[in-house]
Amino acid sequence: MDLSPTQRQLEIRDGVTTVLAAHGASESDVPVSPEPGYDPGLWSELVSSGWVTVGFPEALGGRGGELSDLVVVGEALGNGPVMSPFHGGIVLCGQALLAAAGGGERLRALLAGERTFTYCNWEGFDQPGETQPNVVASESRSGWQLDGSARLVPYGADVDELLVMAHVRAGEQQGPTLFAVPGSSSGLMTNPVPTIGGDRCSDVAFSRVEVDASHVVGEVGQATEWLPRVIDVGRVVIAAEMVGAAAGALSHATHWASTRVQFNAAIGSLQAVQHRLADAFIDVVTAQDSVYDAAGIIDRGEEARVAAAEAKAYCSDACRRVTAAAHQIWGGEGIYSDQPLHLWHRRVAALVPILGSVRNLRSIVAASVLSDSGAQ
């Protein structure tokens, strides 16, 4: 199987890189605005240029293409490294609005940059029977009332609407349902939570939050019919961001090893350093292959739950090894905040727990293996 990038994907990568370079989002300078936790000008340019809307139908405001194209964008943003609402706002929310009935209007607004969204309380719903309902929706006079809480919602205090997965308990209507809750809703409270990646995350509480029927996305109680595939896509794109960050750290460490002189020779001439760099290179390449393999499976319309879990679990471990090796090569210089190495390290660390820990992802793979062996 040929996993090398296509000409279109190379053009997408070059396009994203050009926008990042124009805004100073490079290895030596990564601007981050404290409000809303990313550079709004850069994000606006990425949206208006259409690079972050690849993989979505042109009829709905996207740029067309496949999931593999979104993976290229994620990899380029991770390589920046750039904090943005890409995987949460565009990928996860966009794919949910695309998959759920009646999400077209909101999807158009998202892809046009007219409205911002984030996901809330989604984790675990792709594993039926394993999730306790943190947010519950019950019928009310105006439509629906939401109560409960969710942790670590990315940009939860800054978006126009939160796409909240809630468990409906209303007569015959039961089960997970997606609600688009305005960020300004009465009874919705946010509490900022600092993260290692610097993303603006918040714990969100819902206390008698009222929304009408127009804020139900898709069919009531039927979210699990389409959510697993959306989670698969999210895991693959997040893994791609980790690969990009690891590749950035490796490139920086390689340059350092070739220019840092000790005892009248570049430290890259030492075999121990060469071995570290070689191992890190293998980790980056194999992680990248796992991502593109999983993306290809999704693009072909095949069942991708195991492949997506494998890709994210492997990338979580491999990319952390790469950033750790880069720090060892840089030595004490690598811990200074005026050096960019810690940014790639933080980016990987922040992405690892999203949409399932390594342990949980491996349990998905293990269950599949045991099921297959039992069937034989």
Predicted segment positions?
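Internal helix-loop-helix
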Residues: S48-R108, Y155-D158
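A short, Trp-centered hydrophobic/proline-enriched beta-strand micro-motif
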Residues: G113-G124, V164
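Alpha-helical interface subdomain recognition
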Residues: M1-G78, D232-Q376
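A structural signal for short hydrophobic beta-strand segments in well-ordered beta-sheet cores
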Residues: V135-S138
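Structural signature of FAD isoalloxazine-binding scaffolds in flavoprotein oxidoreductases
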Residues: G64-V73, L111, G129-P133, V181, ...
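Flexible, small-/acidic-enriched active-site or ligand-binding loops
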Residues: Q132-P133, L152-V153, P182-E219
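A generic structural signal for well-ordered coil/turn residues at beta-strand boundaries
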Residues: G113-R115, T131-P133, D158-D160, G175, ...
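A short core secondary-structure module
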Residues: S149-L188
